[in-house]
Amino acid sequence: MTEITDRYFDDLIARLTGLRGRLAEPMAKAAELITAAALADNRVYVFGTGHSHMMAEELHYRAGGLAITVPILCGAIMLQDGAAASSHFERIKGAVLPILERYGIREGDVLIVVSNSGVNAAPIEAARYAREKGAAVIAVTSVTYSNAIAKGRTQLLSLADVVLDNDAPAGDAVLEMEGSSLKVGPVSTALGVTILNAIFADVAAKLVGKGDAPIYLSANMPGSGEVNRELVARYRDRNPHL
């Protein structure tokens, strides 16, 4: 490895090690909310804009993941249909509401909202929408970043039942380079994926203890076809992306 790649690994490992202790309590609370939703046959929706939408895809139809998750996906708030346009769209008040209406979020459900900055209109309105429907809200955000840029704006962390602070710095990138004032090496995606997969592993263990853990198998594993078909049939009614 080079010096800069070593620094990236060192930074990321240090942040993950810190999260392991600091997030123990909120991660446990998040797992309890998600487990309760699963046991009541409710759903866990996952919403993010820009690169944060990858958290929704990560938890959807995932080998080793739970079938209770529903990604909230729309090209306008993702990257493939126009990255610059999506950055503009997520700041337009009211624009995300028709997207949310498609999913039928209701009382007893959980909405995970992922937003590193935690101040743009789309994640704020998603959290408010879920609360109005009686769903619990879990936020994955950078408290440092959000506090640095809020400037009186509503912050996602103020609307959540559980706040999972990913410890990403303002601006996300962590590595300084000689000869440049710019930084490289964003960390929010790696941190967010780790936090959420750890929580869902905890949930899965709890559901196994209750006798019903709807866990997907990798499509290349023996017996996966039957297992996954049964899960898709069971959960398709409230997941338009299966």
Curated annotation (Swiss-Prot):
GO terms for molecular function: carbohydrate derivative binding. GO terms for biological process: carbohydrate derivative metabolic process. It holds the Pfam family SIS_2. Residues 30-214 form the SIS domain. This is UPF0309 protein Oant_1457. It comes from Brucella anthropi (strain ATCC 49188 / DSM 6882 / CCUG 24695 / JCM 21032 / LMG 3331 / NBRC 15819 / NCTC 12168 / Alc 37) (Ochrobactrum anthropi). Gene3D superfamilies: Glucose-6-phosphate isomerase like protein, domain 1. Belongs to the UPF0309 family. HAMAP family: UPF0309.
